Amino acid sequence: MIVFNENGITHLDLHGVRHSDVSEEVIDFIFQYQKLIPLIIICG
């Protein structure tokens, strides 16, 4: 999991994260960075 900022928007890159761990990672990311909305989550 990589968190980075691009053009003023915080991104979460989930490449390489196991499917079983994604839900927990996304919830933690949103709670931690909710004041910086909009957020982008990259999966694929």
Predicted features and spans:
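Long, charged, low-complexity intrinsically disordered regions
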Residues: M1-G44
